[in-house]
Regions:
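Short acidic, Pro/Gly- and aromatic-enriched capping/linker segments at domain boundaries
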Residues: 1-16
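A short beta-strand-loop-beta hairpin characteristic of the jelly-roll/cupin
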Residues: 71, 77-99
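A short hydrophobic beta-strand segment most commonly corresponding to one strand
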Residues: 104-105, 117-140
């Protein structure tokens, strides 16, 4: 492992600009250090991205499910475990994701623009989407795309 390069892990970031409009940016995490996660564990690449209280959810979106326009309730990492889902931001960008793809949602403080506020999300295809959500007890910064490196 000593010759392995540092990882580069991509994620989608749903964020709010200074005008209250949500956007999605494709970002890359590259800040990792090689360390053991426990005293007797072998070294591995670790990138601590948040250090606040968190709640973990597993949610199942039924096939054909489409939610209403809404903001993320709190900043949250969302990782599909199975199935596919989409997120559409207020700027009209639609991102489709499947198992293992990562999204960070923090579209807080958006304003209603033509009936759209926050984002729209739903499932794709004939299968439910199983999502793992790690939700944080921290307010998001405004207009900070790709803030996790």
């Amino acid at each position: 492992m000593s010759s392995a390069p540092k990882p580069a892990i991509s994620y989608w970031h749903l964020w709010t600009d200074a005008d209250g409009v949500s956007h999605q940016s494709r970002c890359t995490m590259t800040e990792f250090k090689k360390a053991a996660i426990a005293p007797q564990a072998a070294p591995q690449w670790i990138g601590a991205k948040t250090k606040v209280a968190a709640t973990v959810f597993i949610t199942v979106l039924p096939a054909g499910w489409i939610g209403d326009w809404h903001e993320n309730p709190k900043p949250q990492w969302i990782i599909p475990l199975s199935g596919r889902w989409f997120v559409e931001s207020m700027d009209g960008q639609r991102v489709e994701m499947g198992p293992g793809e990562i999204s960070f949602g923090e579209d807080k403080n958006t304003r209603n623009v033509g009936g759209k506020q926050g984002h729209l999300s739903g499932t794709i295809g004939d299968d439910p989407a199983v999502l793992m959500i790690v939700q944080f007890e921290a307010p998001p910064p405004l207009a900070s795309p790709c803030r996790f490196r």
